[in-house]
């Protein structure tokens, strides 16, 4: 039987061997913790503490700022030292709550947890929302909102994104290996919300051990299926995953719910389980630290707010001064100029690369080879769109579906002329979106 997949895509060296066999290690922070109030899509959270307040681990320090928002909790005990703008992983300055860690990790007394069997759908959604769970594999969309579509009866599929297709990142892989019960438990909780839905675990076939574990845990679950996907980037893209597992296609103007689907990644489903079954707020995540500049690549369970420099030190520091620092994956992540930034809800990895691993090539003229067209999972013509972008031709850019680009970088990866196709198209997309907002 042919493996499930999508059209286009590429096969970069995955680099996962550096960390895939490293068990998750818990790291306790030493210095101050910084909590940006914007760690999710939507309205920023509103601080509910003041400078000088003493807080406990698990205490809410910022409440949701609206329907599309999420609260933030202290991941250590200590004293609020400041509420002020602070550098975040994207390079911007965001209003943040700074807590001086007292090293005692005194925790709040969590309210008694209601048995899952006795919880209503509303109870489950409220538990997820109150815990501050957001999408931990992408842009950080508040999970309670995602699980509250207007017509829940039309949701046919709950898809667990277990692809982890970005090179070097192995955080989800280790989570699937070490705590698969919580992942399956998270899926079962979501299925409680959608009576007509079937659960799918979409796992790339380079993770046969995960496929085996998940099949064993779900063998008596008629509503859940484990699907092996062809290992190819960007298999973990939302559109590509939905197409591969269900055969349904969506575009940039649609939500997965429009195609009867809800997609959550591994870390998010585990957080859902912890929120509903254990009654714990979202306070930590697993982060991969890898790359050829890192002394001891590995996977680490860390509290939100920990300084990324501390996390790199937990991985033995850098054996060679890195030429490039990346937050997230090498394909869709972003470069960092400083490690003096916190781990947030959406921080999946920290990558450090030496100059030998960083491509530095001068772009030249397009040779019309068509490789970018073959690689594009959105079935676009990236070379043409990049030309329109470079000439600031918004009309032609939108006419030729430039807004359908998901900025996966496949086109730039295969381009023999080394043209910065993704960067040009991505910049133009931002301009178009900004102009559309002005017209509203």
Language-model features and meaning:
Residues 78-80:
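Conserved hydrophobic positions within beta-strands
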Residues 1-48:
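N-terminal, Lys/Arg-enriched amphipathic/low-complexity engagement segments
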Residues 196-308, 314-319, 329:
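Hydrophobic alpha-helical positions that pack around
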Residues 232-236, 240-248, 316-367:
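Active-site gating/interface segments in enzymes
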């Amino acid at each position: 039987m042919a493996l499930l997949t999508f059209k286009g895509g590429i096969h970069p060296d995955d680099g996962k061997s550096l960390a895939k066999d490293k068990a998750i290690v818990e790291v306790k922070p030493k210095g101050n913790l910084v909590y940006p109030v914007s760690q999710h899509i939507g309205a920023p959270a509103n601080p509910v503490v003041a400078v000088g307040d003493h807080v406990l681990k698990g205490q809410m320090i910022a409440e949701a700022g609206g329907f599309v928002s999420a609260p933030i909790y202290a991941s250590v005990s200590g004293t609020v030292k400041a509420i002020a703008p602070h550098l975040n992983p994207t390079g911007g300055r965001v209003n943040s709550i700074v807590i001086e860690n007292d090293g005692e990790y005194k925790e709040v007394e969590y309210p008694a947890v209601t048995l899952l069997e006795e919880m209503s759908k509303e109870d489950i959604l409220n538990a997820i929302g109150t815990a501050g769970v957001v999408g931990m594999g992408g842009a950080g969309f508040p999970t309670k909102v995602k699980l509250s579509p207007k017509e829940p009866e039309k949701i046919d599929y709950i898809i667990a994104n277990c692809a982890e297709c970005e090179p070097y990142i192995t955080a989800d892989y280790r989570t699937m290996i070490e705590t698969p019960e919580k992942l399956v438990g998270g899926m079962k909780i979501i299925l409680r919300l959608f009576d007509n839905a079937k659960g799918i675990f979409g796992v790339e076939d380079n993770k046969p051990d995960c496929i085996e574990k998940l099949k064993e845990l779900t063998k008596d679950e008629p509503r859940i299926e484990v699907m092996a996907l062809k290992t190819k980037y960007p298999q973990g893209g939302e559109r590509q995953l939905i197409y591969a597992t269900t055969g349904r296609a969506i575009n940039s103007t649609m939500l997965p719910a429009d195609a009867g689907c809800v997609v959550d990644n591994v870390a998010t489903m585990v957080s859902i389980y912890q929120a509903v079954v254990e009654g714990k707020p979202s306070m930590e995540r697993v982060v991969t630290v890898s790359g050829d500049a890192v002394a001891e690549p590995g996977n680490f369970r860390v509290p939100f707010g920990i300084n990324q420099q501390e996390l790199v030190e937990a991985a033995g520091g850098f054996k060679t001064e890195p030429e490039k620092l990346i937050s997230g994956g090498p394909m869709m992540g972003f470069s960092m100029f400083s490690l003096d930034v916190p781990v947030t809800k959406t921080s999946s990895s920290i990558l450090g690369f030496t100059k030998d691993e960083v491509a530095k090539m001068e772009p030249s003229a397009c040779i019309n080879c068509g490789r970018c067209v073959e690689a594009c999972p959105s079935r676009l013509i990236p070379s043409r769109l990049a030309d329109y972008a470079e000439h600031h031709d918004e009309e032609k850019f939108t006419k030729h579906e430039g807004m359908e680009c998901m900025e996966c970088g496949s086109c730039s990866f295969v381009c023999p002329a080394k043209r910065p196709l993704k960067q040009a198209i991505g910049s133009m997309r931002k301009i178009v979106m900004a102009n559309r907002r002005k017209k509203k």
